[in-house]
């Protein structure tokens, strides 16, 4: 069975710098409000996502907030963003517009509107443009994005949402998407694949409805396209050889599928339909590995700690690390080349070093299963080194035990989360973290993997010195109701999913057919309130086919993912299409 979903923002993504040059320069209006939505740490040490809105009047601002909530929660439902959202700060910039909507929407002859970012469809209201190419004034966007203080431009992704239900967007460091379209929230993770991960499109066409032709070039630089056979990849240890034969996270099996990079023949990709080909599916493992590397490269796994240099043997060496949502980073210490067991702090006094000079090294890397290439894993690992001179005496230190950066406490965490804390760094003592789950003591260092919890609300506390932090744990999974209906002829099926949760925030619904990849339920491409339609031939919308389902018996699984990241238990419905 094959479900065809829209794969592109436009037939081809045009670099934003090329399509904004013809737009008039604008002076940014000063009335804008920066709202931090997720702050996981110092913006200078995080990857920062800045979300702007255009064409939203003061009266429209509640809709903008809802649009942003949906976009973010869809993003957090997709790996690796789900596991590494703790590496990302998110800021919403509310820019009241004098008028509602954006220019040339939906037609190229429709009204041109004076909005703060000058967003417009049709490649900037060009009669020879592409309707879905949603552009904006990059200078204005930069001015508003700069209202978020302390965020380095080099470590920032700007996403601008247009007040529109028309499908569209564009890629680049200044990405765009329509805020209210049924599928618009799926544009963001696809575009981040380009701008953050350097991934290529896997479309087998350049213009919708026009076959892409045959690729006749050499072996592409793209890590997820090749001319090699599976046997050649294995024998030569090239491209995605480590993943061959695995069940793809995007459905099917990692292998070799013809078409990609706008060509329909002569070039091959790893999966039948990853998010870089069809919006709605996940990244496959090949692209997910690259995105994990790219997100990790935007930050430093060692955030802080004892400065490198010469120290005495009477002190404590410390490192602060990042804390992924679902696992702990690996911290490995060596003294004179020999491994020693320690956590984030190494108390040199306990080593009883012989008089003289010694070398201490620490390495922090990520043991995630998302990475299989050792070179990729090593590319964002970090190390620190110290010279230990036993003749050096550490001066008195007035630093008190206390908290540093922690997992944010302002929103619930999911039941299977890892909660992370960092502490201050007294020179001659290692602060102890005392953990409790619902009042019961548990043993952990700087990362607490939550134990199995019954459905409901729970509380975790951590105490360091006289300071305490408390987290709320949402252990109640979301639910989803399904309505599957067929006419008497049984030749089609409509599926409507309605997710819900006991906590605030947009709840994502997904389904998969006959064990294929999980697919985001967005309603119907033209209307988020309509159910998804399956037929034997599918429905063609703007030269893309949706809901093609062969005649026969099928099992449809469905589930929900809540704002905290909990998965609901998958349920099934069995249908027969005649």
What are these regions (language model features)?
Residues 28-145, 179, 368-370:
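Propeptide-to-catalytic entry region of secreted or membrane-anchored zinc metalloproteases
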Residues 313-317, 415-419, 491-495:
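Structural beta-strand segments of beta-rich domains
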Residues 101-104, 142-178:
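Catalytic zinc-binding patch centered on the HExxH motif and its immediate surroundings
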Residues 63-64, 168-189:
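Short pre-active-site segment immediately N-terminal to the catalytic Zn-binding motif
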Residues 327-384, 410-412, 422-578:
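Long, low-complexity serine/threonine/glycine- and acidic-rich segments characteristic of extracellular
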Residues 1-28:
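Secretory targeting and sorting signals
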Residues 192-208:
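Catalytic Zn2+-binding segment of zinc metalloproteases
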């Amino acid at each position: 069975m094959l479900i065809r979903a829209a794969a592109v923002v436009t037939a081809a993504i045009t670099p934003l710098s090329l399509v904004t040059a013809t737009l008039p320069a604008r002076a940014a209006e000063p009335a804008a409000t920066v709202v931090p939505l997720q702050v996981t740490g110092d913006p200078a040490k995080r990857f920062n996502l800045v979300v702007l809105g255009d064409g939203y009047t003061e009266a429209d601002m509640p809709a903008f907030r809802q649009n942003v909530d949906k976009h973010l929660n869809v993003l957090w439902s997709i790996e690796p963003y789900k596991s590494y959202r703790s590496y990302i700060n998110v800021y919403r910039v509310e820019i009241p517009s004098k008028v509602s909507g954006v220019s040339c929407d939906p037609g190229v002859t429709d009204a041109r509107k004076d909005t703060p970012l000058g967003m417009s469809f049709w490649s900037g209201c060009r009669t020879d443009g592409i309707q879905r190419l949603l552009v904006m004034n990059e200078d204005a966007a930069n001015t508003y994005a700069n209202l978020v203080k302390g965020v380095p431009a080099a470590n920032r992704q700007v996403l601008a949402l247009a007040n529109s239900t028309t499908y569209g967007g564009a890629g680049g460091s200044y990405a765009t998407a329509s805020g209210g379209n049924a599928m618009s929230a799926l544009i963001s993770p696809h575009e981040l694949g380009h701008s953050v991960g350097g991934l290529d499109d896997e479309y087998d066409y350049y213009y919708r409805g026009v076959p892409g032709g045959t690729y006749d070039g050499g072996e592409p630089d793209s890590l997820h396209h090749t001319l090699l056979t599976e046997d050649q990849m294995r024998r030569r240890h090239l491209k995605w050889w480590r993943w061959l034969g695995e069940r793809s996270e995007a459905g099917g099996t990692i292998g070799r599928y013809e078409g990609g990079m706008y060509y329909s023949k002569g070039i091959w990709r790893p999966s039948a339909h990853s998010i870089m080909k069809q919006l709605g599916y996940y990244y496959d493992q090949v692209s997910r590995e690259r995105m994990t590397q790219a997100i990790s490269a935007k930050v430093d796994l060692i955030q802080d700690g004892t400065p490198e240099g010469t120290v005495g043997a009477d002190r404590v060496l410390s490192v602060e690390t990042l804390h992924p949502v679902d696992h702990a980073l690996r911290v490995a210490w060596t003294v004179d080349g020999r491994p020693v067991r320690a956590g984030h702090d190494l108390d040199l006094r306990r080593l009883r070093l012989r008089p003289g000079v010694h070398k201490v090294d620490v390495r922090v890397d990520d043991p995630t299963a998302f990475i299989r290439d050792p070179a990729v894993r090593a590319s964002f690992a970090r190390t620190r080194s110290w010279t230990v001179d036993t003749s050096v005496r550490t001066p008195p230190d007035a630093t008190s035990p206390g908290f540093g950066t922690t997992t944010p406490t302002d929103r619930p965490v999911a039941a299977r989360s890892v909660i992370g804390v960092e502490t201050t760094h007294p020179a001659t003592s290692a602060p102890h973290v005392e953990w409790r789950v619902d009042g019961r003591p548990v043993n952990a260092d700087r990362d607490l993997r939550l134990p199995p919890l019954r459905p409901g609300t729970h509380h975790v506390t951590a105490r360091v010195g006289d300071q305490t932090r408390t987290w709320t744990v949402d252990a109640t999974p979301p639910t989803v109701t399904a309505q599957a209906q067929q006419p008497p002829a049984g030749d089609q099926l409509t599926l409507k999913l309605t997710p819900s949760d006991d906590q605030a925030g947009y709840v994502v619904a997904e389904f998969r057919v006959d064990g294929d990849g999980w697919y985001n339920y967005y309603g119907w491409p033209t209307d988020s309130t309509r159910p998804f339609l399956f037929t034997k031939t599918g429905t063609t919308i703007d030269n893309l086919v949706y809901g093609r389902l062969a005649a026969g018996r099928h099992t449809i699984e469905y589930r929900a993912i809540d704002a905290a990241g909990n998965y609901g238990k998958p349920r099934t419905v069995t249908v027969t299409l005649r």
